[in-house]
Curated annotation (Swiss-Prot):
It comes from Methanococcus maripaludis (strain DSM 14266 / JCM 13030 / NBRC 101832 / S2 / LL). Disruption phenotype: Deletion of the gene leads to completely nonpiliated cells. Keywords: Fimbrium, Secreted. This is Minor structural pilin EpdB. Minor component of the type IV-like pili. Essential for pili formation. A motif (QXSXEXXXL) lies at residues 9-19. It is found in: Secreted; Cell surface; Fimbrium. InterPro entries: Class3_signal_pept_motif. Contains an amino terminal motif QXSXEXXXL, which is part of a class III signal sequence. Residues 1-4 form a propeptide.
Length: 132
């Protein structure tokens, strides 16, 4: 291996790193900061909804009176629980899912990015949801 080959490989690696940095910093500029914030909020809401749903499904096979406390990070959004549907919607996103168990009707408005405490209680025929 000659000295020239090492420096060529170094230059190629350096240019690849430079291209990666330029592309990653261009993304908010191309799509706009607002679009990037919407995508981040939607992703966060999807993760929170998925965590709540999986805990509801686990609780649905538990005995009556079982209780779970779930903490999720939520973007500014409206949370709606109705029949077997959970819906989270906010600025630029609308995500919903269905569960295998009935839910009590409950609405909650998260006015800012915060950690929600979701209280889940298994009743005789449904799961009661309360958010604090």
């Amino acid at each position: 291996m000659s000295k020239g080959q090492v420096s060529v490989e170094f230059i190629v690696l350096f240019l690849a790193l430079l291209v990666a940095v330029v592309v990653s910093t261009m993304t908010p500029g191309i799509f706009g900061l607002n679009k990037s914030v919407e995508l981040s909020s939607a992703s966060l809401a999807h993760a929170a909804l998925s965590k709540v749903k999986s805990n509801i499904e686990i609780l649905s096979v538990s005995g009556e009176g079982s209780y779970k406390l779930v903490y999720v990070k939520s973007p500014p959004a409206n949370w709606t629980f109705e029949n077997r549907t959970i819906r989270v919607y906010g600025n630029g996103f609308n995500i919903s899912t269905n569960t295998s168990v009935d839910l009590n009707t409950y609405n909650y408005l998260a006015s800012s990015l915060k950690i929600l405490s979701v209280n889940l209680t298994r009743n005789d025929k449904n799961v009661t949801v309360a958010i604090q």
